[in-house]
């Protein structure tokens, strides 16, 4: 049964007009459903029919918003990257370096823990050579990382952080925070039910923040 709100038919998401509120809601429903399907089955193993079923939407209604499976897949990945870039963009060059990095790491950990499917989907895309979002990585992502690397380098030059290569610091933050989503099965195999125990997320954040931030605090 199609449980989405019916579109009016007067405006097409494929056109240049601003989407209506109903269209925006249905688009989010599709992207959420597609994320779950793609993260489990991968791009090749997923079908539009599976996504439509997950979204509780008819296939023709879904195809009104996205013409092809490839279009849905790209939209899901770009939506994920937009969310991930937001806390990096928010890093303030005029703020306290340790606190700015603390906020960034905390936000990245929360994203991995709250939406592990998105992290795993992105990891699979990159492992496949980023055939869909390679241009995004080489342009928008690179441009933002270059800007924030200069911010970190300025903090180091002013003695507000210990000497560290800004790119490797950013890579380390990504690797550490996304590990808890991408390698959830491995973590559960080692620590078992502790993963779901109260306080595990806080312990994770405390450990990661302690290691990273203590490693880059200015030396006396």
Regions found by a protein language model. Give the residues of each.
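C-terminal peripheral helix-coil segments that are non-catalytic and often amphipathic
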Residues: 1-14, 110, 114, 142-162, ...
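Helix-turn-helix
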Residues: 2, 29, 37-71, 75
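Short hydrophobic clusters on alpha-helical segments that form packing/core surfaces
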Residues: 26, 30-38, 108, 212
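Hydrophobic/aromatic residues within well-ordered alpha-helical segments
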Residues: 26, 69, 76, 80, ...
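Short coil/turn segments at alpha/beta junctions that flank glycine-rich nucleotide-binding fingerprints
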Residues: 40-44, 115, 158
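Hydrophobic alpha-helical connector segments
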Residues: 89-120, 166-173, 202
């Amino acid at each position: 049964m199609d449980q989405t709100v019916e579109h009016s038919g007067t405006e097409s998401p494929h056109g240049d007009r601003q989407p209506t509120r109903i269209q925006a809601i249905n688009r989010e429903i599709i992207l959420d459903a597609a994320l779950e399907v793609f993260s489990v089955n991968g791009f090749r193993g997923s079908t539009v029919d599976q996504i439509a079923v997950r979204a509780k939407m008819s296939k023709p209604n879904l195809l009104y918003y996205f013409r092809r499976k490839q279009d849905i897949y790209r939209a899901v990945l770009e939506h994920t990257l937009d969310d991930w870039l937001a806390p990096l963009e928010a890093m303030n060059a005029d703020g306290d370096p340790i606190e700015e990095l603390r906020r960034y790491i905390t936000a990245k950990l929360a994203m991995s823990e709250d939406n592990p499917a998105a992290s795993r989907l992105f990891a699979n895309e990159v492992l496949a050579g980023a055939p869909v979002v390679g241009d995004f990585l080489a342009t928008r992502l690179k441009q933002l990382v270059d800007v924030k690397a200069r911010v970190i380098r300025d903090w180091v030059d002013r003695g507000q952080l210990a000497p560290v290569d800004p790119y490797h610091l950013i890579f380390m933050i990504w690797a550490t925070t996304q590990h808890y989503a991408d390698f959830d099965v491995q973590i559960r195999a080692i620590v078992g039910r502790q993963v779901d125990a109260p306080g595990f997320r806080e312990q994770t954040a405390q450990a990661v923040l302690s290691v990273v931030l203590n490693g880059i605090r200015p030396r006396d």
